[in-house]
Amino acid sequence: MLRELLTASHLMSMEQLPGAVCEYAKDVGVHDVLIYVADLQQTVLRLLTGKGHDAGRDPGDEVAEYPIQGTLPGRAYQTVEAVTGRVFDDGRCERWLPVLDGAERIGVIRVTIRTDDAQAMADAEYLAGIVALIIVSKGPYSDSLSRLMRTGPMTVSAEIQWRLMPPLTFANDQVVIGAALEPAYRLGGDTFDYALAGDTVHLAVFDAMGHDTAAGLTSALAVAACRNARLQGAGLVETGQRIEDELVEQAGGRFVTAALAELNIRTGDLSWVLYGHPEPVVLRGGRKVRELKCSPGTPLGTDLEIVPEVCTVQLEPGDRLLLYSDGIIEARDPDRHEFGFQRFVDFIVRSNADGMAVPETLRRLIHSILGHHDGRLDDDATVLLLEWHGPHGVPRDDMAPIKSP
């Protein structure tokens, strides 16, 4: 089944995916397959029907949209665990399974299988993985999927940022990286970047001045210059200088604040530089919080030629590193009270103590910040969280993508 579906997928459109999955899955005892994808803000799960301009029309008798909070499919999405739904008298049951591309949560599938068919249970999990790979491979050129994942109109600046960003989640056996940012549909100058090269993880958070399309273009230029320098082997300060040069030449007086960092995932050695940006934070042992002080340079693009200090620290296995923009802590409620630094780190500490995974921690954090600001932010808010597992990493047997309770 999986081989046939994968072969067929090479010439398959996003609209053809739901029908093809049902057709191939029934041969192995997996029936009534439905595919749900998460929206950009990870608030709801939407049914992919393959029909209409957003591939989500004409759901028939099926539920077109589930909230992620307080539903069975939402629980499968949040916990990354298979969840059993309805159990029928004839020995069949419904199962909800997370759809994952690595650690990136795409959505969930619902299947109907016999409760005593262990092979069908396993095949359903493999099917979820294949569905994820197909969606990710077709997504970059599918307007239908992009429409389905949106719950509102998007500004041009936000369009630039979403097309520029790497996936919101990455994981291997040594490190987990997650990111979240709002307002999803009105992003201005905030963005982030990360990449892995050998034993080195590169991290960056940018905050461009302004909240308009020009801010989006400025941060896009900063990310492009950063990547260009990084791919040519530049160090942190040289990378910052190349971003500075591009902005001075091209951005017309606009500037960005930035935090650039590198982590050796074999040794835990972390290096970072700051350009007018909030200091990184390390959470250790689930409770201890340390702000990483470092003499900053001036924001990039100001042409003031103040070079930042390159600072280093040794991380310990289990440490969580936070890079963020000022919008995270400066979001205000209707009474003008800030969300604040302490509330920010306390939220991460509590989530860590509860054993919450990085992606779900950030999803809940960003919704908490939105709730604090009555659902609408005046400034961009971005957070990048890295969790280091140590030089030996996590045993691969403990990294099953879908957990069956």
Describe the residue ranges of each PLM region.
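Acidic loop->beta-strand submotif enriched in PP2C/PPM serine/threonine phosphatases
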Residues: 90, 258, 294-335, 375-378
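A short, aliphatic-rich beta-strand micro-motif
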Residues: 83-86, 91-102
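Regulatory cytosolic signal-relay segments
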Residues: 126-187
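Conserved beta-strand-loop-short alpha-helix elements that form
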Residues: 199-212, 272-274, 314-335, 385
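Amphipathic alpha-helical "output/dimerization" segments
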Residues: 116-136, 221-224
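Active-site-proximal, acidic helix/loop segment immediately C-terminal to a metal-coordinating Asp/Glu
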Residues: 119-122, 212-232, 296, 320-373, ...
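Catalytic core of PPM/PP2C metal-dependent serine/threonine phosphatase domains
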Residues: 19-31, 153, 157-166, 216-296, ...
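Structured interaction and signal-relay segments at domain junctions
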Residues: 18-80, 275-276, 297
